[in-house]
Structures are given as C-alpha cells and as structure tokens.
Amino acid sequence: MAVMTPRRERSSLLSRALQVTAAAATALVTAVSLAAPAHAANPYERGPNPTDALLEASSGPFSVSEENVSRLSASGFGGGTIYYPRENNTYGAVAISPGYTGTEASIAWLGERIASHGFVVITIDTITTLDQPDSRAEQLNAALNHMINRASSTVRSRIDSSRLAVMGHSMGGGGTLRLASQRPDLKAAIPLTPWHLNKNWSSVTVPTLIIGADLDTIAPVATHAKPFYNSLPSSISKAYLELDGATHFAPNIPNKIIGKYSVAWLKRFVDNDTRYTQFLCPGPRDGLFGEVEEYRSTCPF
C-alpha cells in the first residue's frame, strides 16, 4: 500500500485547489458572458448610450433628411413633412399633430428633434385648422398609413411598421388620446398640453406620457391633463409631467424638457430600449424654482 508523503500530500491538495479555482472562474466567466449582453440583444436599440446632455441638446446623434408631403398627395390629412435618419436602418415611426388653429410649422421642431434620435417622424397639417380632436385622431392614423404605404421607397424602407407612436399638441393631444384608445397596437402616445371634452380614457392600454403646463389657461391641467392622466388605467405604463412657468403654447417652440422626455419615452417604449429608463424612473425632480412643477408615473417600467 502506497504511503503519501507530506510533500506529495501538499502537492495533491494544491492541484485540487487549482482545479476548483479554475472551474469556479470558468463558471463565473460563463455567467457574466450570458448576462452582460442583455440590452445589446435588443434589435431595436439605436444610437449611443444616452446622457442628459445628449437628450437636452437641440439635435441628436443621427443626421436627418426631409421629404415633403404635399396637400394634394396626402390622403386623409393635410400634408406635412417626413423627417428620417440618413443612416440606412429600420426605425419606429411617429406622427405628430398641431393644435386648434395651428399649422405644421408650430410642431416642426419636434419632427427634426425626434428623428435625430433614430425615428421616422411626420409632422402634419390638418385638413382645416379648426378640426376637432377626434378628426385629428383620424388624420394622425392616415399620416401613419401614408408613411408606411405611400411615402418614397427611401422612407418606407426605414420604417418598422410594427413600432408606431403618436403625439399631438392641444386638440392634437386630444386626438392622440383618442387614437391610442382605438389602436392598442401603438407603442407610445404623448399628448402635449392636451384638450378634449372627454375626460375618461380608461380604455387606453398604450404607454402614455402626458405633458401639461402649470400656466395653461386654454386647457388648464386641473380640467384636462390631470384628469386625463388619472383616468388612464394604473396597470399601464404612464407618466404625467407638468412644466413649471409654462403656458398652453409651450410645445410650439423648442423646449429641452419636452424634447428630452418625449425622446426618452419613445426610446423606452417604441424601441424597448431600457437604457432610457433612468430618465423616466424616478424621473425629473420637481418643486420650487425647477423646470418641472410635477412628475408622477407608474414606475418601475
């Protein structure tokens, strides 16, 4: 019977320890390699890692081109402009409506801003400037259909028609809520200082960000934006952001808060890009001397 000397015993113990260490290291590397690419596996992720500075800038990381949609060529809406990233890839698509008596020019800045973060965006003129919210819902839907089916091949080839969203100002915001209630397949809705006679949107299941303005006397938040938000089901992803010191017409000029949180919402829910959750949960700080009067949501998303 062989007898193990102290030297051989120490050598054997060291060998077994090294084997155990190597096995543990291999298991750790395997676990890390499996867990690390979680967000990278998202096929809809576009653009660099987001920062506050990037989202608050006047334009995003993508160069943008435009395509005019004449009133004569438009079907079901009043024409407009399509903004799209020059980079050849597929993107979610967004339609944006102006408000009562407003024209496309009043929301044009949003088209270019959002497109520069990796979306195909159409800003529209309505058939008449006096069109009511439910008519604007129909026109937003027609604008989405135009981008998917009738725009140039350059635009159509860039659109992922399974990832659509709508936005609108004032009565366009009311139209946004109406279309969201009619099309649960939409990935996101963003009403901006919205106006609508209907106060109950409990049928909406689309992730919805409502942006109100504390000095709005046309669609006061107490009778519009807040009741709209409160009526949305608590089971859906939703958020309410109230601008501090802003009026009903805040969405008509470039606004870094509207731009930042609109892009973050679209990225999170149209692109399923969780890199943007950090800007929405817990969201902006509100209170005295800030740019945001109030923020609340159904975080976590």
Curated annotation (Swiss-Prot):
What the entry lists under PANTHER family is as follows:
DIENELACTONE HYDROLASE DOMAIN-CONTAINING PROTEIN-RELATED, POLYKETIDE TRANSFERASE AF380
By sequence similarity, the record places it as follows:
Belongs to the AB hydrolase superfamily.
**What regulates this protein's activity?**
Activated by magnesium ions. Activated by calcium ions. Inhibited by the serine hydrolase inhibitor phenylmethanesulfonyl fluoride (PMSF).
Question: What's a Pfam family in this record?
Answer: PETase
Write the signal peptide boundaries: 1-40
Documented effect of changing D244R: Increases the thermal stability of the enzyme
Tell me what effect the entry lists for H169W. Increases activity on poly(ethylene terephthalate) (PET)
Q: Which InterPro entries match?
A: AB_hydrolase_fold, FrsA_esterase, PET_hydrolase/cutinase-like
Highest taxon of the source? Bacteria
Q: Which Gene3D superfamilies match?
A: alpha/beta hydrolase
Keyword Flavoprotein attached: no
Q: How does activity depend on pH?
A: Optimum pH is 8. Optimum pH is 6.0-6.5. Optimum pH is 7.5.
Disulfide connectivity?
C281-C299
Q: Where in the sequence is the active site?
A: S170, D216, H248
Q: What is its EC number?
A: 3.1.1.74, 3.1.1.101
Activity under varying temperature: Optimum temperature is 25-50 degrees Celsius. Optimum temperature is 55 degrees Celsius. Optimum temperature is 60 degrees Celsius. Optimum temperature is 65 degrees Celsius.
Query: Where does this protein come from, organism-wise?
Result: Thermobifida fusca (Thermomonospora fusca)
Self-association or partners: how does it assemble?
Monomer.
Functionally, this protein is described as follows: Catalyzes the hydrolysis of cutin, a polyester that forms the structure of plant cuticle. Shows esterase activity towards p-nitrophenol-linked aliphatic esters (pNP-aliphatic esters). Also hydrolyzes the triglycerides triacetin, tributyrin, tricaprin, and trilaurin, with a preference for short-chain substrates. Hydrolyzes the hemicellulose xylan. Capable of degrading the plastic poly(ethylene terephthalate) (PET), the most abundant polyester plastic in the world. Can also depolymerize poly(epsilon-caprolactone) (PCL), a synthetic aliphatic biodegradable polyester.
The keyword Hydrolase belongs to this UniProt entry's keyword annotation? yes
GO: which molecular function terms? Answer: cutinase activity
> What is the designated name of this protein?
Cutinase cut2
Cellular compartment(s): Secreted; Periplasm
